[in-house]
């Protein structure tokens, strides 16, 4: 079989990646045609073709996050590469091993005004430094880069390809699936000493892990953190911020002496206040380069702990009571019909209908926060969300990528495990092109996307932007109603759609998806003009 020098270089590059990846997302283009034909000739890789590089890069990111291994996205030159920047930013801050493999014009064309040609070297800045490859003897840099200590970071390999790009015949099929190997190489910040005789509270966020020695400590855990043994509701932070609380004639000290941060918590302002309180001793545990210390006053930073002392039963009771009061308050507010059917109700329905073995994806903004308020995380449910830079970009693609990664773990099962995704309407519309899956591409076999549609930006109702004095310009600047027909959009992409407008019908629709496979969008039409009052009612329960 004949081949061009460009194809020889492309094959060497894919050969160097294949031991580390199982999935590659491919975008069509001319300059990357040697890579495209080589990838489709491989029998050891799953290839997912997408036409939009931004959505494609988020598909690759979610595959990598869910599988905890590298996934590559491949594209042609020019703006195609620039479209990957949002996904690269999320990958860098969430420590996801996303690989961007871009085709480029040869150096002699850069700066000449040649079509579809920009300077791609350094296009992602320090988020993913560029490794340039122009010759066969430079391909070894790929393996060297992937072997570096900081394995959980994005990479950018920029492959300069000159004409002739491809030979007239297709490459022969080759490659035997043997299973890619990958090991995360975490950063060790050392051991710190923790005295559990002090009133200690753990706050666990994204990238948290089960820390030996802290298993029984009261823990505020975000939905993407492991389920703690002694969970504390996030709204309880409002109670624990107080020096003392009076109840039934007793006065108890509720403020913790020591807060231990594990991973990267970011969701709740009250929780962040606990982390930032200079009167509270702060320990930060991390296995990455990010030290989550919003108040910049950490007393110690480590990755493991040496435990001394024992927890007081009174402190455990205080945390349990504060948590129970907060959780009951949320359910009381949900039962209050004056707020109507809101995004918080949608999150409660999703959480209440999850089963052991399900996987949950939640986009940034209100969905992940609402899930936290209604009781996540749960045992037996893996939860994923973009918490690196917490953008709404690529949410549909990430939901699909999560489902594809989950079903790839169980190729021999008659029915793929269930994946449920909770998105807001703006997140859904922002990445509506993510629904476009070609007829020959792997498709989600058991995915339900729930869209909480309040016709705009509901989160801004809860922030300073929702204040009465700003209401005259609120709708245009923040509410941004769109009046889009999600049903028609789904029909255009060939995706099954169901519409509900109340809690009971939503629960029925979600339960129905546990009985059948397929790819379904459930649109829950909600209100947002009561979200601010609903939030104030929640705060009243704990203040």
Curated annotation (Swiss-Prot):
As cofactor, the record names: Mg(2+); Mn(2+); thiamine diphosphate
Q: Which Gene3D superfamilies match?
A: 3.40.50.970, TPP-binding domain (3.40.50.1220)
Q: Name one GO molecular function term.
A: manganese ion binding
Describe the reaction catalysed, as an equation. Answer: isochorismate + 2-oxoglutarate + H(+) = 5-enolpyruvoyl-6-hydroxy-2-succinyl-cyclohex-3-ene-1-carboxylate + CO2
Q: Write out the pathway annotation from the protein's UniProt entry.
A: Quinol/quinone metabolism; 1,4-dihydroxy-2-naphthoate biosynthesis; 1,4-dihydroxy-2-naphthoate from chorismate: step 2/7; Quinol/quinone metabolism; menaquinone biosynthesis
Keywords, ordered alphabetically: Magnesium, Manganese, Menaquinone biosynthesis, Metal-binding, Thiamine pyrophosphate, Transferase
Q: Which InterPro entries match?
A: MenaQ_synth_MenD (IPR004433), THDP-binding (IPR029061), Thiamin_PyroP_enz_TPP-bd_dom (IPR012001)
Q: Which SUPFAM superfamilies match?
A: Thiamin diphosphate-binding fold (THDP-binding)
Q: What is its EC number?
A: 2.2.1.9
Q: How is the cofactor bound?
A: Binds 1 thiamine pyrophosphate per subunit.
Q: Could you tell me what this protein does?
A: Catalyzes the thiamine diphosphate-dependent decarboxylation of 2-oxoglutarate and the subsequent addition of the resulting succinic semialdehyde-thiamine pyrophosphate anion to isochorismate to yield 2-succinyl-5-enolpyruvyl-6-hydroxy-3-cyclohexene-1-carboxylate (SEPHCHC).
Identify its protein family.
Belongs to the TPP enzyme family. MenD subfamily.
Please state what the protein is called.
2-succinyl-5-enolpyruvyl-6-hydroxy-3-cyclohexene-1-carboxylate synthase
Where does this protein come from, organism-wise? Corynebacterium glutamicum (strain R)
């Amino acid at each position: 079989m004949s081949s061009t020098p460009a194809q020889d270089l492309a094959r060497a590059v894919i050969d160097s990646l294949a031991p580390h990846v199982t999935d590659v997302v491919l975008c069509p283009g001319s300059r990357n045609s040697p890579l495209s034909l080589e990838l489709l000739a491989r029998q050891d890789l799953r290839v997912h073709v997408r036409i939009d590089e931004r959505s494609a890069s988020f598909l690759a990111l979610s595959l990598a996050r869910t599988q905890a291994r590298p996934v590559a996205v491949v594209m042609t030159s020019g703006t195609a590469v620039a479209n990957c920047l949002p996904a690269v930013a999320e990958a860098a801050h969430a420590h996801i091993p996303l690989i961007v493999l871009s085709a480029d014009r040869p150096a002699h064309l850069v700066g000449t005004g040649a079509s579809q040609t920009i300077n791609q070297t350094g296009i992602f800045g320090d988020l993913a430094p560029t490794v340039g490859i122009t010759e066969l003897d430079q391909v070894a840099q790929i393996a060297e880069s992937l072997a570096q200590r900081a394995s959980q970071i994005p990479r950018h390999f920029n492959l300069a390809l000159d004409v002739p790009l491809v030979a007239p015949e297709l490459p022969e099929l080759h490659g035997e699936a043997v299973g890619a190997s990958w090991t995360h190489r975490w950063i060790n910040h050392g051991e710190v000493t923790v005295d559990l005789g002090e009133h200690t509270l753990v706050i666990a966020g994204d990238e948290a892990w089960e820390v030996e020695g802290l298993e029984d400590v009261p823990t505020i855990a975000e939905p993407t953190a492991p389920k703690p043994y002694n969970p504390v509701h996030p709204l309880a932070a409002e109670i624990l911020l107080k020096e003392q609380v009076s109840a039934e004639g007793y006065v108890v000290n509720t403020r913790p002496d020591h807060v231990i941060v594990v991973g990267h918590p970011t969701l709740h302002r009250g929780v962040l206040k606990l982390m930032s309180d200079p009167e509270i001793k702060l320990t930060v545990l991390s296995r990455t380069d990010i030290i989550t210390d919003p108040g910049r006053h950490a007393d110690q930073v480590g990755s493991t702990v040496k435990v001394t002392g024992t927890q007081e039963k009174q402190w455990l009771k205080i945390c349990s009571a504060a948590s129970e009061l907060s959780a009951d308050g949320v359910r009381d507010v949900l039962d209050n019909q004056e707020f109507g059917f809101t995004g918080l109700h949608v999150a409660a329905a999703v959480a209440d209908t999850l089963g052991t073995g399900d996987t949950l994806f939640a986009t940034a903004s209100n969905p992940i926060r609402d899930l936290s308020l209604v009781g996540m995380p749960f045992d037996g449910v893996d939860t994923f969300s973009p918490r690196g830079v917490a953008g709404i970009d690529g949410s549909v693609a990430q939901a699909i990528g999560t489902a594809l990664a989950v079903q790839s773990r169980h190729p021999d099962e008659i029915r793929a495990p269930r994946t449920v995704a909770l998105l807001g309407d703006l997140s859904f519309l922002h990445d509506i092109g993510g629904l476009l899956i070609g007829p020959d591409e792997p498709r989600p076999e058991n995915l339900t996307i729930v869209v909480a549609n309040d016709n705009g930006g509901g989160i801004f109702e809860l922030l300073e932007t929702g204040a009465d004095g700003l209401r005259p310009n609120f709708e245009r600047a923040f509410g941004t109603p769109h009046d889009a027909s999600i049903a028609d959009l789904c029909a255009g992409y060939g995706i099954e759609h169901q519409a509900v407008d109340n809690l009971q019908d939503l629960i029925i629709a979600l339960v129905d998806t546990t009985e059948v496979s397929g790819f379904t969008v459930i649109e829950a039409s909600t209100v947002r003009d009561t979200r601010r009052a609903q939030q104030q009612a929640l705060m009243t329960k704990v203040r």
